[in-house]
């Protein structure tokens, strides 16, 4: 029996080989204890403040919105140490691993941001680290691969399947099933088997807590909308968590539309997927009629995933969050637009959320509206990808 509810409505669960159940129960037990442990909380708060650089600012876009009545604020997770929101939860998981007396960390990565965050947390806390990464992602994220290796991590190329995040996840789980006694699997998003979606949400909820306090200080009221990109869904659930009960706030999750959701080349699992079992969970998954997992597609490596975290599937089913899609070209345009007008280069993942905010602004230029966009990471890693896309 689990200590916490392992489902969000009908989504979630622990669909893993029996051999991994003791490791998941141990992790859940340690997590529950940590929530009551003042020393653990102090350690994590200290690392977030003095190592990662929290709180991150909430920045008003003054040039982007000129000539409209829209106010767009950016939650600046791009300024966090490591370059993305991923650092928030890896520090929490690394501390849990230390408490469980684990010596090694296993991780997966797509865009490389979770890999970088895992590597830096392991360097800091003296843990061995091996990271699985698809060969397609290694090719498009060479800078992050070098950063991981520089911090002492072993990067293991995954050649199976399409050589992307899905395949890296499968290999990481396979490794963990053989080495769970000494190793902790540091999952990178709010997906996978229970208790991972709950753990990752807890450690990413700092984004939403800060944002809510900051927007009240600046506007003295709640925003009209909070917008975040959704791949696995950790940055989105992190910022949404503080606003879910505020029903006047529109929560908008932006999925990767790729070349278009009418094609086979996209990653919009909530919009186009069906309920299925994948990666140890029941959620919305891109699959064939026979139940085979489809290959996802996105210009953004971090969104190139054929499923979504179970809480997002539940929030979609109860219509608390609206899920939309943005194409590769729309995301690249937003990437250029913010860079040119505000001097902020966002990650391609975050550019999907930004593109939808720009769409709302352009569709309702005279409407008084306050939008918050979670800039989940910085775009240095994507410069070559964007350059290649623009030179096509």
UniProtKB/Swiss-Prot annotation:
Question: What are the UniProt keywords, alphabetically?
Answer: Amino-acid biosynthesis, Aromatic amino acid biosynthesis, Lyase, Pyridoxal phosphate, Tryptophan biosynthesis
Q: In which pathway does it act?
A: Amino-acid biosynthesis; L-tryptophan biosynthesis; L-tryptophan from chorismate: step 5/5
| Enzyme Commission numbers on file | 4.2.1.20
Enzyme class, top EC level, equals lyase
Q: Could you tell me which residues carry N6-(pyridoxal phosphate)lysine? A: 86
Which reaction is this enzyme known to catalyze?
(1S,2R)-1-C-(indol-3-yl)glycerol 3-phosphate + L-serine = D-glyceraldehyde 3-phosphate + L-tryptophan + H2O
Q: Which GO terms describe its molecular function?
A: tryptophan synthase activity
Q: Tell me the first and last residues of the signal peptide.
A: none
Q: Which residues cross the membrane?
A: none
- Domain of life according to the entry: Bacteria
Q: Is Lyase one of the keywords?
A: yes
Which cofactor(s) does the record list? pyridoxal 5'-phosphate
An example GO CC term for this entry is: cytoplasm
Question: Do you know which InterPro entries this protein is assigned to?
Answer: Trp_synth_b_CS, Trp_synth_beta, Trp_synth_beta/beta-like, TrpB-like_PALP, TrpB-like_PALP_sf
**Stored Pfam families:** PALP (PF00291)
Q: Which family does it belong to?
A: Belongs to the TrpB family.
How does this polypeptide assemble, per the annotation?
Answer: Tetramer of two alpha and two beta chains.
Give the function comment from the record. Answer: The beta subunit is responsible for the synthesis of L-tryptophan from indole and L-serine.
- Stated name of the protein: Tryptophan synthase beta chain
**Which organism is this protein's natural source?**
Buchnera aphidicola subsp. Schlechtendalia chinensis
Lineage of origin: Bacteria, Pseudomonadati, Pseudomonadota, Gammaproteobacteria, Enterobacterales
Name of encoding gene: trpB
């Amino acid at each position: 029996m689990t200590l916490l509810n392992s489902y969000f409505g009908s989504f979630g669960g622990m669909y893993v080989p029996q051999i991994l159940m003791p490791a998941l129960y141990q992790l859940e037990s340690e997590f529950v204890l940590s929530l009551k442990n003042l020393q653990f909380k102090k350690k994590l708060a200290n690392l977030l403040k003095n190592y990662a650089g929290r709180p991150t600012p909430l920045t008003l876009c003054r040039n982007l919105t000129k000539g409209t009545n829209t106010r767009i604020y950016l939650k600046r997770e791009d300024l966090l140490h490591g370059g993305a929101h991923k650092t928030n939860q890896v520090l929490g998981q690394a501390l849990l691993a230390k408490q469980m007396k684990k010596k090694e960390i296993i991780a997966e990565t797509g865009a490389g941001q979770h890999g970088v965050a895992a590597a830096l947390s392991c360097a800091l806390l003296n843990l061995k680290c091996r990271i699985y990464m698809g060969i397609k992602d290694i090719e498009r994220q060479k800078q992050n691969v070098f950063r991981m290796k520089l911090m002492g991590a072993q990067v293991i190329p995954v050649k199976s399947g399409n050589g992307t995040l899905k395949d890296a996840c499968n290999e990481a789980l396979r490794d963990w099933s053989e080495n769970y006694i000494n190793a902790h699997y540091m999952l990178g998003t709010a997906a996978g088997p229970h208790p991972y979606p709950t753990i990752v949400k807890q450690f990413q909820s700092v984004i939403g807590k800060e944002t809510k306090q900051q927007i009240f200080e600046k506007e003295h009221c709640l925003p009209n909308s909070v917008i975040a990109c959704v791949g696995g869904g950790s940055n989105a659930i992190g910022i949404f968590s503080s606003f879910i009960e505020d029903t006047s706030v529109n929560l908008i999750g932006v999925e990767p539309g790729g070349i278009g959701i009418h094609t086979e080349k996209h990653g919009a699992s909530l919009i186009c997927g069906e309920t299925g079992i994948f990666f140890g969970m029941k959620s919305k998954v891109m699959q064939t009629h026979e139940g085979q997992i489809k290959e996802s597609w996105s210009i953004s490596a971090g969104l190139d995933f054929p499923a979504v975290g179970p809480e997002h599937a539940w929030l979609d089913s109860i219509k608390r969050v609206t899920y939309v899609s943005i194409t590769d070209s729309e995301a690249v345009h937003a990437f250029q637009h913010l860079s040119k007008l505000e001097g902020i280069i966002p990650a391609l993942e975050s550019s999907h959320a930004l593109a939808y905010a720009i769409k709302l602004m352009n569709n309702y230029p005279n409407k008084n509206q306050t939008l918050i966009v979670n800039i989940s990471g910085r775009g240095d890693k994507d410069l070559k990808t964007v350059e290649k896309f623009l030179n096509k």
